[in-house]
Amino acid sequence: MPYIKNIKTSNIIAGLLCLLAVPVLMASQEWNDHDRSKKLLAPDLATDYLESCAPNAIVISFGDNDTYPLWFAQEVLGVRKDIRVINSSLLGTDWYINQLRYKINDSNPIDPIWSKEQIQGSSRDVIYEASRVFGGNAGMANQFLQQAGITDPSQPMDLYTMMKDFAGSDSPNKTQASQDGTAINIFPTRKVSIPVDVNLVRQNKTVNADDSVLSSIQFEIPKSILYKNDAAILNIIAANKWKRPIYFTSPYGELGF
Protein backbone atom coordinates (compact mmCIF):
# COMPACT_ATOMS: atom_id res chain seq x y z
CA MET A 1 0.00 0.00 0.00
CA PRO A 2 2.75 2.55 0.78
CA TYR A 3 4.26 1.74 -2.64
CA ILE A 4 0.97 2.50 -4.41
CA LYS A 5 0.60 5.77 -2.49
CA ASN A 6 4.13 6.77 -3.52
CA ILE A 7 3.30 6.06 -7.17
CA LYS A 8 0.18 8.25 -6.96
CA THR A 9 2.13 11.04 -5.28
CA SER A 10 4.87 10.82 -7.90
CA ASN A 11 2.32 11.00 -10.71
CA ILE A 12 0.71 14.09 -9.20
CA ILE A 13 4.07 15.80 -8.75
CA ALA A 14 5.10 14.90 -12.30
CA GLY A 15 1.84 16.28 -13.68
CA LEU A 16 2.24 19.54 -11.79
CA LEU A 17 5.82 19.91 -12.99
CA CYS A 18 4.69 19.41 -16.58
CA LEU A 19 1.97 22.01 -16.17
CA LEU A 20 4.44 24.50 -14.72
CA ALA A 21 7.07 23.72 -17.31
CA VAL A 22 4.95 24.96 -20.21
CA PRO A 23 4.45 28.59 -19.06
CA VAL A 24 7.99 28.74 -17.67
CA LEU A 25 9.40 27.60 -21.02
CA MET A 26 7.21 30.03 -22.92
CA ALA A 27 8.18 32.92 -20.66
CA SER A 28 11.89 32.16 -20.84
CA GLN A 29 11.91 31.86 -24.63
CA GLU A 30 9.28 34.42 -25.67
CA TRP A 31 9.30 37.16 -23.01
CA ASN A 32 11.64 39.46 -24.89
CA ASP A 33 9.74 38.93 -28.14
CA HIS A 34 6.54 40.19 -26.51
CA ASP A 35 8.07 43.12 -24.66
CA ARG A 36 6.49 46.21 -26.19
CA SER A 37 7.92 48.71 -23.74
CA LYS A 38 10.21 50.13 -26.44
CA LYS A 39 7.65 50.06 -29.25
CA LEU A 40 6.49 53.66 -29.26
CA LEU A 41 4.72 54.01 -32.60
CA ALA A 42 1.20 53.85 -31.14
CA PRO A 43 1.65 56.38 -28.29
CA ASP A 44 3.81 58.66 -30.45
CA LEU A 45 1.27 58.68 -33.26
CA ALA A 46 -1.57 59.28 -30.81
CA THR A 47 0.33 62.16 -29.23
CA ASP A 48 0.94 63.68 -32.67
CA TYR A 49 -2.76 63.35 -33.50
CA LEU A 50 -3.78 65.15 -30.32
CA GLU A 51 -1.13 67.85 -30.50
CA SER A 52 -2.15 68.68 -34.07
CA CYS A 53 -5.73 69.51 -33.01
CA ALA A 54 -7.08 72.94 -32.20
CA PRO A 55 -8.09 73.66 -28.57
CA ASN A 56 -11.25 72.02 -27.23
CA ALA A 57 -11.52 69.81 -30.30
CA ILE A 58 -13.63 66.73 -30.92
CA VAL A 59 -11.84 63.71 -32.43
CA ILE A 60 -13.98 60.90 -33.83
CA SER A 61 -12.00 57.67 -34.09
CA PHE A 62 -12.79 54.30 -35.63
CA GLY A 63 -12.21 51.05 -33.77
CA ASP A 64 -9.89 50.00 -30.97
CA ASN A 65 -6.58 50.48 -32.80
CA ASP A 66 -7.42 54.14 -33.39
CA THR A 67 -8.95 54.85 -30.01
CA TYR A 68 -6.93 53.15 -27.28
CA PRO A 69 -3.62 54.91 -28.08
CA LEU A 70 -5.46 58.25 -27.97
CA TRP A 71 -7.01 57.42 -24.61
CA PHE A 72 -3.62 56.22 -23.32
CA ALA A 73 -1.97 59.46 -24.39
CA GLN A 74 -4.63 61.46 -22.58
CA GLU A 75 -5.19 59.44 -19.42
CA VAL A 76 -1.65 58.13 -18.80
CA LEU A 77 0.64 60.65 -20.49
CA GLY A 78 -1.62 63.63 -19.78
CA VAL A 79 -1.63 64.87 -23.37
CA ARG A 80 -4.32 67.35 -24.44
CA LYS A 81 -7.09 66.54 -22.00
CA ASP A 82 -9.15 69.37 -23.49
CA ILE A 83 -9.93 67.14 -26.48
CA ARG A 84 -12.92 64.78 -26.52
CA VAL A 85 -12.02 61.48 -28.18
CA ILE A 86 -15.15 59.67 -29.38
CA ASN A 87 -15.09 56.04 -30.48
CA SER A 88 -17.59 55.79 -33.34
CA SER A 89 -18.13 52.06 -32.75
CA LEU A 90 -19.32 52.67 -29.19
CA LEU A 91 -21.76 55.34 -30.35
CA GLY A 92 -24.12 52.50 -31.14
CA THR A 93 -24.85 52.14 -27.41
CA ASP A 94 -27.01 54.36 -25.23
CA TRP A 95 -24.62 54.41 -22.26
CA TYR A 96 -21.74 55.73 -24.38
CA ILE A 97 -23.83 58.45 -26.02
CA ASN A 98 -24.99 59.50 -22.55
CA GLN A 99 -21.35 59.97 -21.48
CA LEU A 100 -21.13 62.80 -24.01
CA ARG A 101 -23.49 64.84 -21.84
CA TYR A 102 -20.85 65.26 -19.12
CA LYS A 103 -17.55 67.05 -18.84
CA ILE A 104 -14.59 64.65 -18.97
CA ASN A 105 -11.14 65.90 -17.94
CA ASP A 106 -10.94 69.38 -19.49
CA SER A 107 -13.35 68.58 -22.31
CA ASN A 108 -16.73 70.29 -22.14
CA PRO A 109 -20.01 68.36 -22.54
CA ILE A 110 -21.36 67.57 -26.01
CA ASP A 111 -25.00 67.89 -27.01
CA PRO A 112 -26.21 64.60 -28.57
CA ILE A 113 -29.60 66.27 -29.37
CA TRP A 114 -31.70 63.30 -28.29
CA SER A 115 -32.67 62.71 -24.67
CA LYS A 116 -31.70 59.64 -22.66
CA GLU A 117 -35.19 58.22 -23.15
CA GLN A 118 -35.02 58.66 -26.92
CA ILE A 119 -31.95 56.43 -27.24
CA GLN A 120 -32.60 53.98 -24.42
CA GLY A 121 -31.97 50.34 -25.27
CA SER A 122 -32.83 49.54 -28.88
CA SER A 123 -34.67 52.82 -29.45
CA ARG A 124 -33.40 54.44 -32.66
CA ASP A 125 -30.94 51.63 -33.32
CA VAL A 126 -32.00 52.04 -36.95
CA ILE A 127 -33.56 55.02 -38.73
CA TYR A 128 -34.89 54.62 -42.26
CA GLU A 129 -35.12 57.04 -45.14
CA ALA A 130 -38.76 57.75 -45.98
CA SER A 131 -38.60 56.26 -49.49
CA ARG A 132 -37.24 52.99 -48.11
CA VAL A 133 -40.05 52.71 -45.58
CA PHE A 134 -42.56 52.90 -48.43
CA GLY A 135 -40.75 50.33 -50.56
CA GLY A 136 -39.40 52.86 -53.03
CA ASN A 137 -42.87 54.24 -53.80
CA ALA A 138 -42.02 57.92 -54.30
CA GLY A 139 -45.66 58.99 -54.38
CA MET A 140 -46.48 57.47 -51.00
CA ALA A 141 -43.24 58.77 -49.49
CA ASN A 142 -43.88 62.32 -50.74
CA GLN A 143 -47.46 62.23 -49.48
CA PHE A 144 -46.24 61.14 -46.05
CA LEU A 145 -43.59 63.88 -45.97
CA GLN A 146 -46.03 66.58 -47.07
CA GLN A 147 -48.42 65.56 -44.31
CA ALA A 148 -45.47 65.87 -41.92
CA GLY A 149 -44.85 69.44 -43.10
CA ILE A 150 -42.13 68.96 -45.73
CA THR A 151 -43.35 70.65 -48.90
CA ASP A 152 -40.39 69.88 -51.18
CA PRO A 153 -38.49 66.68 -50.27
CA SER A 154 -36.08 67.22 -53.18
CA GLN A 155 -34.49 70.21 -51.44
CA PRO A 156 -31.66 69.79 -48.89
CA MET A 157 -32.93 69.82 -45.31
CA ASP A 158 -31.25 71.52 -42.37
CA LEU A 159 -29.36 68.74 -40.57
CA TYR A 160 -30.22 69.89 -37.05
CA THR A 161 -33.91 70.20 -37.89
CA MET A 162 -33.93 66.79 -39.54
CA MET A 163 -32.27 64.99 -36.64
CA LYS A 164 -34.10 66.80 -33.82
CA ASP A 165 -37.58 67.41 -35.17
CA PHE A 166 -37.99 64.47 -37.54
CA ALA A 167 -35.66 61.55 -36.78
CA GLY A 168 -35.96 62.50 -33.12
CA SER A 169 -39.74 62.68 -33.18
CA ASP A 170 -42.13 60.00 -31.96
CA SER A 171 -45.15 61.82 -33.35
CA PRO A 172 -47.50 59.54 -35.34
CA ASN A 173 -47.31 61.85 -38.38
CA LYS A 174 -43.51 61.52 -38.49
CA THR A 175 -43.20 57.78 -37.87
CA GLN A 176 -44.65 54.63 -39.37
CA ALA A 177 -45.91 51.57 -37.53
CA SER A 178 -44.06 48.30 -38.13
CA GLN A 179 -45.76 44.92 -38.39
CA ASP A 180 -45.42 44.40 -34.64
CA GLY A 181 -46.84 47.84 -33.91
CA THR A 182 -43.61 49.58 -32.88
CA ALA A 183 -42.81 52.96 -34.37
CA ILE A 184 -40.30 53.20 -37.22
CA ASN A 185 -38.25 56.38 -36.96
CA ILE A 186 -37.66 58.12 -40.27
CA PHE A 187 -35.32 60.68 -41.81
CA PRO A 188 -36.94 62.53 -44.72
CA THR A 189 -34.11 62.93 -47.21
CA ARG A 190 -30.47 62.10 -47.89
CA LYS A 191 -29.77 65.67 -48.98
CA VAL A 192 -28.83 67.76 -45.98
CA SER A 193 -27.49 71.22 -45.31
CA ILE A 194 -25.44 72.67 -42.44
CA PRO A 195 -25.62 76.47 -42.12
CA VAL A 196 -22.26 78.15 -41.57
CA ASP A 197 -21.88 80.76 -38.85
CA VAL A 198 -19.55 82.99 -40.86
CA ASN A 199 -18.62 85.29 -37.98
CA LEU A 200 -17.88 82.39 -35.64
CA VAL A 201 -15.69 80.44 -38.08
CA ARG A 202 -13.64 83.56 -38.65
CA GLN A 203 -13.45 84.30 -34.94
CA ASN A 204 -12.31 80.81 -33.95
CA LYS A 205 -9.94 80.67 -36.95
CA THR A 206 -11.59 77.72 -38.64
CA VAL A 207 -10.92 79.76 -41.78
CA ASN A 208 -8.48 82.54 -42.48
CA ALA A 209 -9.72 86.09 -42.15
CA ASP A 210 -9.46 86.75 -45.91
CA ASP A 211 -11.02 83.44 -47.02
CA SER A 212 -14.40 83.41 -48.73
CA VAL A 213 -16.96 81.41 -46.76
CA LEU A 214 -20.10 79.67 -48.00
CA SER A 215 -23.36 80.28 -46.20
CA SER A 216 -23.96 76.53 -45.89
CA ILE A 217 -22.36 73.15 -46.49
CA GLN A 218 -24.43 70.61 -48.36
CA PHE A 219 -23.82 66.90 -48.74
CA GLU A 220 -25.74 63.74 -49.48
CA ILE A 221 -25.96 60.75 -47.16
CA PRO A 222 -25.09 57.78 -49.42
CA LYS A 223 -27.42 55.23 -47.84
CA SER A 224 -31.04 54.79 -46.85
CA ILE A 225 -30.40 53.44 -43.34
CA LEU A 226 -28.79 55.25 -40.42
CA TYR A 227 -27.59 53.11 -37.56
CA LYS A 228 -27.42 54.62 -34.09
CA ASN A 229 -23.71 55.40 -34.33
CA ASP A 230 -24.20 57.09 -37.74
CA ALA A 231 -27.07 59.17 -36.39
CA ALA A 232 -25.05 60.09 -33.28
CA ILE A 233 -22.23 61.47 -35.45
CA LEU A 234 -24.70 63.55 -37.46
CA ASN A 235 -26.21 64.81 -34.20
CA ILE A 236 -22.79 65.82 -32.86
CA ILE A 237 -22.03 67.76 -36.05
CA ALA A 238 -25.47 69.38 -36.20
CA ALA A 239 -25.55 70.44 -32.54
CA ASN A 240 -21.96 71.68 -32.53
CA LYS A 241 -22.86 74.70 -34.68
CA TRP A 242 -19.19 75.44 -35.40
CA LYS A 243 -18.32 76.02 -31.73
CA ARG A 244 -15.67 73.26 -31.62
CA PRO A 245 -13.44 71.86 -34.38
CA ILE A 246 -14.29 68.27 -35.33
CA TYR A 247 -11.66 65.85 -36.64
CA PHE A 248 -11.88 62.31 -38.02
CA THR A 249 -8.97 59.87 -37.78
CA SER A 250 -9.93 58.48 -41.20
CA PRO A 251 -12.43 59.31 -43.98
CA TYR A 252 -16.01 58.35 -43.19
CA GLY A 253 -17.53 57.47 -46.53
CA GLU A 254 -20.56 55.84 -44.93
CA LEU A 255 -21.97 59.30 -44.27
CA GLY A 256 -20.64 60.93 -47.40
CA PHE A 257 -17.76 62.78 -45.75
Give short role names for the model-derived ranges.
Residues 1-56, 71-257:
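ER/secretory pathway lumenal C-terminal domains and tails of membrane proteins involved
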